[in-house]
Amino acid sequence: MKKRLLFPIIFAFIFSSCSDFSGNEDAVEASLKPGPVTRTTTPTPTPTTTYYDMDGITFGNNIFVAVGDKGAVLTSSDNGATWDNGTSGTKKQLNEIAYGDSTFVAVGDDGTNLYSSDNGATWSSGTTTETSDYDGVANGDNVFAAVGNTNIIRSTDNGSTWSTITSFNVKDVTFGNSRFIACGTDGAIKESDDGDNPWLSRTSGASGITLHGITFGNNLFFSVGGSGKLIKSSDNGTSWVNIPSQVSTTLYSIAYGNNMFLAVGSNTVIASTDNTGSTFGIKATGYTFEDVTFGNGVFVAVGYKIIYTSTDGISWTQVYGE
């Protein structure tokens, strides 16, 4: 009996095992199939904008042009609202820029001088034997004069070639009423009719003070400097009088426009109450600008990685920077 029952039992076991395997066939097959592939997409980095320390600015031919650190050149054709990067061809520090005779001329460290006749689109290097730093440049009567920490140089061909004129340590220069006037250390004031010799020394009354900026407007010359120094000349730079600035911080630059003289400096903006510059008042605080210019009804000021615009010196709008 036991022998006859063994075969059915074995058969039943085999049949049952095969049935179990057949029932799990789909699960086994599914487990062997590869799962969905997860693809990781690296996000495209957001482009970063590099802002430069801007040191000088001017207006000409309806264009504002600013210059600064590492050869930076910026241009604006919409009254300072937007700015385009230019290519100067140098990495040297550019300290100041001027316009005249359909040409922009920029000067900077190590004797760097550049000129552009296409509104700052392209730049060429001028020829000079000097290697000192230049801080100021101005144009008048078909002449460009540049000033720096060791000498004054002059160009009569729109910045293409330069001649060394004399040895002075001066910081800035302007042109008005057929004369160049420069300002500098220890209250220095120098004057020349055509940028050539002689450069005559004038008494400023600012001994011991470095005069950083100078401008001409409404037949008046104004210069500004350390400790809030502000001086004025109404006789073409021959004599100078002190004007209370209402501030004690350093003033770096001054410009004329909208019937007032406006000066900028360390954490301050001041302006005259009328076009004679007899009295000045504080317009704004908290702004440190290194240079200011005026054009098309707008003041444009530059500083460390910033550019601001204003029509009245009170309200300022940032148009460039971090």
Range-by-range predicted roles:
Residues F21, E25-E322:
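Residue-level hotspots at or immediately adjacent to binding/recognition sites across diverse folds
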